[in-house]
Each structure stands twice: as structure tokens, then as C-alpha cells.
Amino acid sequence: VALVGGEAAYFGLQTQGSAPTGKIAIFSVWGGQDADGPEYSGPFGGEGTGMTVRIRHRWEPGRRERLVLAAEGDGWWRAEVSGRLVGRIRVDATWGGIAPQTVMWTERYAPPLRRCADLGHAVAIFGEPVADGGVRPLGHRNHLAPNPGCPGSFVEDLDGGVRHVMGAPAAPGP
């Protein structure tokens, strides 16, 4: 997500976290000024700088997870996954709310592929985002980034959301 008048943030689930290791829930904001969380909070660098909070979260394939991001006032943003606090990050209090455009994505978080078989098969289903107790998007656009020539990755619309597939044997037919 982007914050009006500020920078970008992301919130999601990962298979291989660092501090803590293993499956995690993570919330990060570029340009964040402070962070507080039950397991890990601190600065990040590498692709810009900011603050991050993370918790161990044993998500399971096929289980629905509810991610909630809420403004708490005085520049603080709170992230929860399935009712559990991931943490809070403080940004410049002049930044506004969530910008009108948001992005949901899947990412292979690993070294570059040496062969297509290394991609593996993964599926993520995203429900339609809802803001401020019921505000829903007017529309959406699917985009698939270029892949290294490996077949089987696609994005498709579902009733109330989208499905991201990576490394499938073949894309669905018409």
C-alpha cells in the first residue's frame, strides 16, 4: 500500500523470515520512524530504509488469513493477522491514510532461477480488499510480471478476489 503524502508499506505472510526465522507475518514501512511489536521490531535497509515488525506465524496452505491494517493516530499504524498483533509502526504524522491504489502480489523470495523446475508450484488466493468498514474497490487490473521463460504462472479472477499461480504444469484453458 502507499500512504497519502508519504511512502510505501507492505504487509503479508512469508515462508522464510529472518529474525524470527521460519513462517512469519511481516509489516514494513519505508520512511517509518519507530516500531513496536511483540516479537521483532527494528529498522530495515537494502532496498530503501524504514521500520519493520514481524512475528512467527504458522500459516497453513488453504487456511484463510485476515490481515488488518489500521491507523491509530499520531502517525501510528497497527497490523494484525487473524486477530494477532504483528506490531505497530510510526510514520510522519502528516502522512494521510491509505492511497487509492493498492497492490497484492506473490513473490519467489530466493536466488535467481537456474532452471524452471526450481520455481516450484505455489498458489495464493487474495480476497477483495475492504477499507473503512466496507469501502470496496471500483475495479482492478491483473498484471503478471515477465518470467524467465518458465511456463505455468498466471493470475485469474475469482468471485470476490484473484488467484496467483506460480510454477503450475499448464495455465487453465478457456
Question: Predicted segment positions?
Answer:
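Activation corresponds to long, low-complexity, non-globular regions
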Residues: 106, 111-174
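Short, aromatic/His-centered strand-loop micro-motif at the edge of beta-sheets
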Residues: 42-66
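Carbohydrate-binding surfaces in secreted/extracellular proteins
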Residues: 59-87
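Short, hydrophobic/proline-enriched secondary-structure or compact coil segments at domain edges
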Residues: 25-29, 100-110
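Secondary-structure transition/turn motif
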Residues: 30, 81-84, 141-143
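Short, surface-exposed beta-strand/loop "edge" segments at domain boundaries and coil↔beta transitions
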Residues: 33-40, 85-86, 109-119
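Short, solvent-exposed beta-strand-to-loop segments that form ligand-recognition rims
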Residues: 81-99
